[in-house]
Amino acid sequence: MKILSCLCSYKGCLSSKEANEIILNHNHQNHPDKEVDCFSFADGGEGTLSVLKSIYPDRKTGCYLLPGPIKCNEAQAEYGIQKDTRIIETSKVLGLNLNPDLDFDSTTSFGLGILLKYGLDNGIRKFLVALGGSAIADQGAGARYALGYRFYGKEGKEIFPLSGNLGRIQSVDSTKADQRFKECSFTLLADVKSPLLGENGSTYLFSEQKGAKKEKLPIYENGRKHFNSILVNCGFPDVSMLPSSGAAGGLGSFFYRFGKTKVLSGAEFLLKEAHRKEKIKDYDYVLLGEGHTDRGTLEGKSIMPRLSLIRKSKAKAVLLSGIVDEDVLPELKKQGVSFFCPLHDKACKDYQKSAKEDLEKAYDKFLSLLEK
């Protein structure tokens, strides 16, 4: 029996590499008759740099100390270098793990703007940006601030933009904006296809996992609509309904507005880079997993691109996510998931403490199902 462990990161818990190594080591110690290979994976979001480093170990990387998603906190933001292209993983500077208190209202993409500005200062005009795993929902307003844009409220008082105050912004001043940004081209890696606005947009799909209260979602959605209209009135294109414009808290829309932007499936991109697409057919089972499988998963993130590849092979898909919402089970079965072995029955506060043991138990449960 040949098994491919192709787990994504379990946000706030385990990286893709850690999760797959847990399976590999546990199998070696307890199920030596099973052959397991690992492929640390990302969907274009969290873990992308790590995967690219494993594929191309000789490529250079760098690191900056930057403001995190909560401006007063710092983040060690690693980036990659590929010839004349700067590779940025938004979760390195804006990740959920950098906002442990899930203070949704206070988050900002300011640090990302600083990281982009450093690239501009070094002559970089091409960026490969992995979207996903972010704690923010400010549509890139904080990044704009770092690049020279200024925002004002009703009485003309300057406002520092945050995920929770977009509805207060009444005007934008771009007279001191960094014009070099218009010279840039951006390739975005994202498997979230959701638009910025609407009932299937980023507010309703992803804000709760970032700390937003469910009863406040309409308020946040109205704030996003308002800020979007402010930008449109300033001459920026309305990109709010484009696919992936809602990715990473609206950062997709931020890059779209500067033109010269294309979006690629992160999963497809990484599978192609690793030459793994053609190898899936060699396995009997492929292990998939993420922290929380929900409606957002069905929008194309994480496991969905790999399911499409698995369906074309003899392999069967096994889902080892931390939590799997019941309302997505029917569609996942249609998409080819053969075994469901979630780590938890429902959301719990202390799952981080037992992540390793829970993942091992879920894997054991899958193997026991095969024996029935």
Predicted features and spans:
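N-terminal loops that bind phosphate or other acidic moieties
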Residues: K2-L131, A135-K372
